[in-house]
């Protein structure tokens, strides 16, 4: 009885398995006929391998639209810091986010639910990238603290966003004729290195191509809000290459130079005028003051040129320093003239004494030749008829000179008059120079620069 029961249960179990297998096969056949596929969800790793891995067929060495129209790459930059504008080397340093966007249809996807993928920077080696470089770059640094400062984002439609943080040292040829009241224009040029315009074209992003961090300030310059965007297509022997540029206008703030150069030199010039009020007999004081101001002005002039390049043209600060040195030197020469005039009375009296001595010698000589007093005839001249007449002097003796004190007073008054005139003439001349100087450089030339 038990044996029969076991056989019955075994037969029922086999029937159940056969029925279940038939049902599964029927469902698969029905699904295949109706076109339905079993649902499968790819893992992120499998999806990336399928999108740009070895099995995807994607080749990073070939640009999008190969043998077709050029790839349009839109660029924009965000300026984090702007500074270290150096006149001696004529360059500036800037820290930026460089963002490039282009479309690569080979990276379009629909199997993954997200609209965009933010990928690790290491994936940059697996995709094609534009060969952008900065044409006027003198030095550059990447940033990798705490990790590589790079961003890679791929959208469903194949749009690629590549962002990178850079610190650049860019050349900036400067015109220093109006220094330190100048406005400099510094450029940043983005160019393709290997792809010609048949393969690659750079364009500025239409919305916010150049952005500046809020509150960005420079030590000596004001960064103007107006930024000129344009194209700078380069023509070489190897072809025509795409290039875009942005021009930054930097207006120098002259507060530093006003305190360090203009005001000290102005005070030195005014100090040199103090000698006009010092007594002309105090030669050591006036000479020491004059020489000290000249040497100080020379040192000040040399210091103003220490931080500037050796250019062939004259700068505004050079004219100021040269004129200040000229006024200080003229004040020293003024005392030399005063001292010379005040001592002229001694030379005048010496010449008068010499003239008087010569006249006396001539009289003595004349008397020795025609003196007949020994014969009782006195000063006589012999004429043809043998008679003698009394001789009269040919040149009468000069009038006695004026009193020496009066002559001295006359020349001293002349010297004092020079000091008196200088007290008004020097400040007036310097004031006129200042009017012309500041009008020329601060108003006229400043407006000309802005028009350009």
Swiss-Prot record:
Changing residue 396 to T: In MRXSP; uncertain significance. Residues 279-283, 337-420 are cytoplasmic. Changing residue 350 to A/K/I: No effect on the kinetics of inhibitory post-synaptic currents. Glycine 2 binds at residues 99, 163. The record marks 295 as: Important for obstruction of the ion pore in the closed conformation. Pfam families: Neur_chan_LBD (PF02931), Neur_chan_memb (PF02932). Zn(2+) binds at residues 226, 228, 249. Residues 28-256, 305-315, 442-452 are extracellular. The keyword Ion transport applies. The chain crosses the membrane at residues 257-278, 284-304, 316-336, 421-441. PANTHER family: NEUROTRANSMITTER GATED ION CHANNEL (PTHR18945). Subunit of heteromeric glycine-gated chloride channels. Plays a role in synaptic plasticity. Contributes to the generation of inhibitory postsynaptic currents, and is involved in the down-regulation of neuronal excitability. Plays a role in cellular responses to ethanol. This is Glycine receptor subunit alpha-2. The gene is GLRA2.
């Amino acid at each position: 009885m038990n044996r029969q029961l076991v056989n019955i249960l075994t037969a029922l179990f086999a029937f159940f398995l056969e029925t279940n297998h038939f049902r599964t096969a029927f469902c698969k056949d029905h699904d295949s006929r109706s076109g339905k596929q079993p649902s499968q969800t790819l893992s992120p790793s499998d999806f990336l391998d399928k999108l740009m891995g070895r099995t995807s067929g994607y080749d990073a060495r070939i640009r999008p639209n190969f043998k077709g129209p050029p790839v349009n790459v839109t660029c924009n930059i965000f300026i984090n810091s702007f500074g270290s504008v150096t006149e001696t080397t004529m360059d500036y340093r800037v820290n930026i986010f460089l963002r490039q966007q282009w479309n690569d249809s080979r990276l379009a996807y629909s199997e993954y639910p997200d609209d965009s993928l933010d990928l690790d920077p290491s994936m940059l080696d697996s995709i094609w990238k534009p060969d952008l470089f900065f044409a006027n770059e003198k030095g550059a640094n990447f940033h990798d603290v705490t990790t590589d400062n790079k961003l890679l984002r791929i959208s469903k439609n194949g749009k690629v966003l590549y962002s990178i943080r850079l610190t650049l040292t860019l050349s900036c040829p400067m015109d220093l004729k109006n220094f330190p009241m100048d406005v400099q224009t510094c450029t940043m040029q983005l160019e393709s290195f290997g792809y010609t315009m048949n393969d690659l074209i750079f364009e500025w992003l239409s919305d916010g191509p150049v952005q500046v961090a809020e509150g960005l300030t420079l030590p000596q310059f004001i960064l103007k809000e107006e930024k000129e965007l344009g194209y700078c297509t380069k023509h070489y022997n190897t072809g025509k290459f795409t290039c875009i540029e942005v021009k930054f206008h930097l207006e120098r703030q002259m507060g530093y130079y006003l305190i360090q150069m203009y005001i000290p030199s102005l005070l030195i010039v005014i100090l040199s005028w103090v000698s006009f009020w010092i007594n002309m007999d105090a030669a050591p004081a006036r000479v020491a003051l004059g020489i000290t101001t000249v040497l100080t002005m020379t040192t000040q002039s040399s210091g103003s040129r220490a931080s500037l390049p050796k250019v062939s043209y004259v700068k505004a600060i050079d004219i100021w320093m040269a004129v200040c040195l000229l006024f200080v030197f003229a004040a020293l020469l003024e005392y030399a003239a005063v001292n010379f005039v005040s001592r002229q009375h001694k030379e005048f009296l010496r010449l008068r004494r010499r003239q008087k001595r010569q006249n006396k010698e001539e009289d003595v000589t004349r008397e020795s030749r025609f003196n007949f007093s020994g014969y009782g005839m006195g000063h006589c001249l012999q004429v043809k008829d043998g008679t003698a007449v009394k001789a009269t002097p040919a040149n009468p003796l000069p009038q006695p000179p004026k009193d020496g004190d009066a002559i001295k007073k006359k020349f001293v008054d002349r010297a004092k008059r020079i000091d008196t005139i200088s007290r008004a003439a020097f400040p007036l001349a310097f004031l006129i120079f200042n009017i012309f100087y500041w009008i020329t450089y601060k108003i006229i030339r400043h407006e000309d620069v802005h028009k350009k």
